[in-house]
């Protein structure tokens, strides 16, 4: 008997009929003798609906008190879907109980709307499992040291599921979604994209950080830190599919690099539309400038991605970096109001119409020429590269967003990713 964690996304929970199918699938696993913990997302569109109501009431509000109420509001979406799934399981003859994050409890810090999990108390869940119940834990949320409900940010249910799996020392965490695994790139952009049977943890971490929507990056970080066995598979296969066939479907996230994986120089093309570029011009070229700029941004809980500092000329330089597009206006205001006056820079400019395109592959460690091949391919399509970022197993470029799909298709073809 294994302890298995299932996570279901919003599309998988998108209607009562789909919730019923999820219940049948979970019941099948439980009847096969497994202890089952399920982490569902809110029903598709529900979180956006709830946050939209808040925006109607306070369009421009952005402070801690407001963010606290947003978390109270948004958390109800997962609470509703969890209770509905428990009811559906009970209708299938399965003993089941649902818990909100604060009831478990899943303990987080106090960063409302972007909280991070600090610990999970597994006593209550283990007691229910020992009694033969299926336990449903709300994704996306927890409770801070002061008893306030917090949410983990977009995609937080993935993180919840992997964190629960880590805390429970689960045998496997299965992430059910609306796609049947991890692909070489988004099939909606490149129809020839292939599903990967396995992908290394490092590659998945890079893909998640670079914009792949299959898994949320913090969930992959958790999986890597605690060595949680993880698989991505489709919730739209028939619920009564043979359980052994289902257990081997989708894409396995592996922590071992086998020979076949070594042979692939590039495993996938990732892209992210949600980027914005900010440039601080005419910055005095002296020690501490990077900290003055990025320290203030970090203090505002804004994540920075690609960073470039130009060569100095006449004692001045330009400093550019990218942030999430949702943080663009806030970052611009912060720099203009609090940083620019004390910095001695000439101005701050921004561009929210950019995107990031990346090639990823563990084979890049031991093969040269992948970056130049990428640059040549983009050049042949007339695509200008604005910024470049590299690591051992990825190369990313920032380009005009209107060329994103062209760039992805060109790179997918250049690296022969349509061929097995």
Language-model region placement:
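Acidic-aromatic/histidine active-site loop/patch
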Residues: 223
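Conserved dinucleotide-binding and phosphotransfer motif residues
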Residues: 32, 92, 226, 300, ...
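Glycine-rich beta-alpha junction loops
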Residues: 43, 179-181, 226-230, 234-239, ...
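Nucleotide/pyrophosphate-binding catalytic subdomain
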Residues: 1-220, 310, 399-400, 415, ...
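A conserved regulatory-domain signal marking ACT and ACT-like small-molecule sensing domains
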Residues: 243-420
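Short hydrophobic alpha-helical runs that function as membrane-insertion/retention elements
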Residues: 172-176, 230-232, 305
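Terminal amphipathic helices with adjacent charged low-complexity linkers/tails
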Residues: 40-51, 183, 232-258, 315-316, ...
């Amino acid at each position: 008997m294994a302890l298995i964690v299932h996570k279901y996304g919003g599309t998988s929970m998108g209607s009562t009929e789909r919730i019923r199918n999820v219940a049948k699938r979970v019941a099948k696993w439980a009847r096969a003798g497994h202890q089952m913990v399920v982490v569902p997302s809110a029903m598709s569109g529900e979180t956006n609906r709830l946050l939209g109501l808040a925006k109607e009431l306070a369009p421009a509000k952005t402070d801690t008190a407001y963010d606290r109420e947003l978390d109270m509001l948004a958390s109800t979406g997962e609470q509703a879907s969890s209770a509905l799934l428990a009811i559906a399981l009970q209708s299938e003859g399965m003993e089941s109980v649902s818990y909100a994050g604060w009831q478990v409890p899943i303990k987080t810090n106090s960063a409302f709307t972007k909280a991070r999990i600090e610990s999970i108390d597994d006593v209550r869940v283990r007691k229910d499992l020992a009694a033969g119940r299926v336990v449903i834990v709300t994704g996306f949320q927890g409770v801070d040291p002061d008893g306030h409900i917090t949410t983990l940010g977009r995609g937080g249910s993935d993180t919840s599921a992997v964190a629960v799996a880590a805390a429970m020392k689960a045998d496997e965490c299965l992430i059910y979604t609306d796609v049947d695994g991890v692909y070489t790139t988004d099939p909606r952009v490149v129809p020839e994209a292939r599903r990967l049977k396995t992908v290394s943890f490092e590659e998945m971490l890079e893909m998640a950080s670079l914009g792949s929507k299959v898994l949320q990056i913090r969930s992959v970080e958790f999986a890597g830190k605690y060595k949680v066995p993880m698989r991505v598979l489709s919730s739209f296969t028939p619920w009564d599919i043979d359980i052994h066939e289902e257990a081997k479907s989708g894409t396995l996230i592996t922590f071992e690099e086998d020979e076949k994986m070594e042979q692939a120089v590039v495993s996938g093309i990732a892209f992210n539309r949600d980027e914005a570029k900010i440039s601080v011009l005419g910055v005095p070229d002296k020690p501490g400038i990077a900290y003055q700029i990025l320290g203030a941004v970090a203090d505002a809980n804004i994540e920075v991605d690609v960073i470039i500092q130009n060569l100095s000329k006449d004692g001045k330089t330009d400093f550019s970096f990218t942030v999430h597009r949702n943080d663009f206006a806030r970052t611009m205001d912060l720099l203009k109001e609090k940083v620019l006056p004390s910095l001695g820079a000439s101005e701050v400019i921004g561009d929210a119409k950019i995107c990031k395109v990346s090639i990823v592959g563990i084979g890049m460690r031991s093969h040269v020429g992948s970056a130049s091949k990428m640059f040549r391919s983009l050049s042949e399509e007339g695509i200008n590269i604005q910024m470049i970022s590299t690591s051992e197993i990825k190369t990313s470029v920032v380009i005009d967003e209107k060329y994103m799909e062209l760039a992805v298709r060109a790179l997918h073809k250049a690296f022969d990713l349509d061929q097995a």
